[in-house]
Amino acid sequence: MTTNKSYLTYFTDALWINNQPLIAILGICSALAVTTTVTTALTMGFAVSFVTGCSSFVVSLLRKITPESVRMIAQLIIISLFVILIDQFLKAFFFTISKTLSVFVGLIITNCIVMGRAESMARHVSPIPAFLDGLGSGLGYGWVLVCISIIRELFGFGTILGFRVIPEILYTSAAHPDGYENLGLMVLAPSAFFLLGIMIWIVNIIRAPKTKR
């Protein structure tokens, strides 16, 4: 039971307490490019979770036989392997989404979260905790992207997951010249950073200890 609780802690800490985009401010560059729709955000979150979890597991598994002098090169090779696997998987089964994400799946290898978890956690703990930490970090990254993408897609396109949420009848037309119009700002890249900044601010307020009066 104690072991199970310990394993669960690795996962939950990475998911919320040590959330990489909100607390460590890592992996935020992709928030600019892949959060215009919920579909792309979900896909990127899944891809990063897979790569981070699996690469952390393998790095931990090989930690005792990996020479210190080449450990970062070895970690990059391991990460590259899983990035190639997820990239080929998306191209084979979800080609449209893969085409939309373009080079950003391949650029997961440069994501600070993946290397950060391998270097700071996976090479110091056993494989199962390393995997849970990597998976939690990836999912923590993913839910932040999804939250941003929901707002951007809703107000930028009037849809969520491609389904119409804001009725067409509310939009500006010849019959309704003063109707609703999509917020063009939400489609632009800077909106992702504004929304991420607001999320970081809210999380810091929630996490901040209450001052004693």
From Swiss-Prot:
EC code: 7.2.1.1
One MF annotation (Gene Ontology) recorded for this entry: oxidoreductase activity, acting on NAD(P)H, quinone or similar compound as acceptor
Protein's GO biological process: sodium ion transport
Entry's Gene Ontology cellular component terms: plasma membrane
Topological category with respect to the lipid bilayer: Multi-pass membrane protein
Catalytic activity: a ubiquinone + n Na(+)(in) + NADH + H(+) = a ubiquinol + n Na(+)(out) + NAD(+)
Chief subcellular location: membrane
Sequence intervals crossing the membrane: 22-42, 43-63, 77-97, 101-121, 131-151, 183-203
Subcellular location(s) per record: Cell inner membrane
Entry-linked InterPro entries: NqrD, NqrDE/RnfAE
Keywords, ordered alphabetically: Cell inner membrane, Cell membrane, Ion transport, Membrane, NAD, Sodium, Sodium transport, Translocase, Transmembrane, Transmembrane helix, Transport, Ubiquinone
NCBIfam families linked to this entry: nqrD, PRK09292.1
Family classification: Belongs to the NqrDE/RnfAE family.
Reported function: NQR complex catalyzes the reduction of ubiquinone-1 to ubiquinol by two successive reactions, coupled with the transport of Na(+) ions from the cytoplasm to the periplasm. NqrA to NqrE are probably involved in the second step, the conversion of ubisemiquinone to ubiquinol.
Record text on subunit structure and interactions: Composed of six subunits; NqrA, NqrB, NqrC, NqrD, NqrE and NqrF.
UniProt protein name: Na(+)-translocating NADH-quinone reductase subunit D
The organism's taxonomic lineage, starting at the top: Bacteria, Pseudomonadati, Chlamydiota, Chlamydiia, Chlamydiales
